[in-house]
Amino acid sequence: MGMYTGLRFKGTVKEEFRDSFEDIAMHGRWAESDDYMFYAFGCDYRASFIPCGCLAYMPEEWEIESIDRKYAIDTDGFDRTYDKESGRWTFQCSLKNYDDTIEKFLNMVPYFVEDVEHAEVFYEEWDCSEKWELIDGKMVMTNDKFVNYTHSDLGFC
């Protein structure tokens, strides 16, 4: 059946991309973009799951559940939002990362994002998530024991 990997993201889209980025930010329409980099990423089978993949097998701390799953509330400000004026983009999602879709996304982030406030990756069988940061024009994994989701106190690993 396959395992899920989650991604939580908060960042600022570069000004030159802001006007045309809303369909991607809110609907995952990478392949419909006129920008070649976005289009090429959109050709990945699971690209639209970023940012639109619903959470599956992610830590309970990532959302407040509801009786009806579609009404669950994202926590910590990771609900899917995009502000065209400021470029602020937030989301959390999960997907089966068979083709390294998340890694492809992270590699592309420096192309269209000027600032990353939070980038976190969590594989459903891990105890701890990874923290990623934008450093010198590259996304770099800076902490492979970022948040421990196996303990009720939610401390660092």
Tell what function each PLM region has.
Residues 1-35, 156:
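Short, extreme N-terminal segment that most often corresponds to the first beta-strand
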